[in-house]
């Protein structure tokens, strides 16, 4: 059942998962929000109970946001940074915090609120939880990435992560620096009780995600090595998944529901 209004009955006995979508680009507004099949796996948890608390799912659309420097078209080789103002990612963090406050004001205990996101939404989840984990129960970052298909474009499987980042910094020095700044800020967290799902064949940050393991509290899970999970072929709808970046939206990913519920 879909409730388009922000209504939570018996809020003290609810667990709220806030679902954040990916982005078509890093900093500009977009016409799209959630794609087909995006909800299926998290929606499969709705109405299940954990310690007599019922799970609900809230889909937060922030696709219309744009960063303060978006008009400057800063994704270019001669942009040196630093970024002036708030990025779209920062504004998405703020939107989540506003929603969290509304839910808490309605009576939902803060530790029963969880933030999750895919791709740029997963990157944003890391940004939010690293600074505001006191306001929620935890987070789930799914194939987190927001700076392009770095792993594929720069052939990470052949040259290694360090060489990929060197080439990226040479081509887009300011952009690469902005990514590094965000990673450094996320790594400042002293305890980050979140799940971080990655896949080695993800064309975005598939082989560039080891840094997240340095953060205390993070449980990194490598989804699979291929396009099966526990012997089950991964599909989105009726189509086989061929892009590992989308494997967290495939039916096979529900294998991890018990892990998520923990």
Per-segment meaning from a language model:
Residues 74-106:
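Alpha/beta-hydrolase active-site loop
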Residues 34-49, 198-236:
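Active-site-adjacent alpha-helix of alpha/beta-hydrolase-fold enzymes
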Residues 146-224:
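The feature captures the conserved acid-bearing segment of alpha/beta-hydrolase catalytic domains
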Residues 216-262:
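C-terminal catalytic histidine-bearing segment of alpha/beta-hydrolase fold enzymes
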């Amino acid at each position: 059942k879909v409730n388009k209004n922000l209504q939570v009955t018996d809020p003290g006995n609810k667990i709220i998962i806030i679902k954040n979508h990916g982005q078509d680009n890093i900093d500009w507004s977009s016409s799209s929000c959630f794609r087909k099949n995006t909800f299926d796996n998290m929606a499969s948890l709705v109405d299940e109970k954990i310690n007599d608390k019922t799970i609900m799912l809230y889909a937060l659309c922030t696709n219309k946001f744009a960063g303060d420097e978006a008009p400057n078209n800063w994704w270019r080789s001669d942009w040196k940074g630093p970024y002036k103002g708030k990025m779209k990612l920062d504004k998405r963090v703020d939107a989540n915090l506003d929603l969290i406050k509304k839910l808490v004001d309605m009576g939902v205990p803060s530790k029963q609120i969880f933030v999750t996101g895919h791709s740029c939404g997963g990157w944003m989840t890391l940004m939010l939880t690293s600074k505001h984990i006191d306001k929620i129960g935890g987070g789930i970052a799914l194939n987190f990435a927001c700076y392009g298909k770095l792993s594929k474009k720069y052939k990470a499987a052949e040259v290694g992560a360090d060489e990929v980042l060197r080439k990226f910094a040479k081509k887009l020095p300011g952009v690469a620096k902005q990514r590094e700044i965000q990673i450094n800020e996320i790594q400042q967290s002293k305890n980050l009780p979140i799940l971080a799902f990655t896949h080695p064949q993800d064309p975005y940050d598939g082989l560039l995600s080891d840094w997240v393991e340095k953060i205390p509290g993070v449980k990194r899970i490598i989804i699979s090595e291929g396009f099966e999970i526990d012997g089950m072929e991964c599909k989105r709808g009726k189509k086989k998944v061929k892009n590992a970046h989308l494997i967290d939206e495939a039916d096979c990913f529900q294998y991890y529901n018990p892990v998520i519920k923990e």
